[in-house]
Amino acid sequence: SCLHCADAPCVTVCPTGASYKRSEDGIVLVNEDACIGCGLCAWACPYGARELDPRQGVMKKCTLCVDRIYNEALPEEDREPACVRTCPTGARHFGDLSDPASPVSRLVAERGGYDLMPELGTRPTNKYLPPRKKGAAEAGPLMPLVDVQATGLAGWLDRILGRF
């Protein structure tokens, strides 16, 4: 999915200006009326976030559900991207990273969130969170080892290799 980079190479490489970054919020979008489907943006994106829609002949990408996040007809709790709203494990989060007091900013700070491939200089706005450390109580008990005797070809191979 698109990382909505601050320095988005997909925007600068687009020959028609169809790929653009909104000044008000930094969301990177594609104007499908101006897109010629050349694929330069897909080539330039180091994250593989672009794909060609062969039927329409234009490039497609994540829009951050811009139609949802600003839709005042929706209840406040529904104004988030569909991927965040429907993630079955709650692994995705959404919010204002420019506000250090926002829940998502606090989460990134507490968990040590980081940029994907920072050496590329694209400055992605999406952050990745490292896995949570699990305590012994959370991890659950270990299953007992089962003594399995290999049979057939695996048994023969075990016997042969056991000689060395």
Range-by-range predicted roles:
Residues 1-164:
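Non-ligating segments of multi-cofactor redox enzymes
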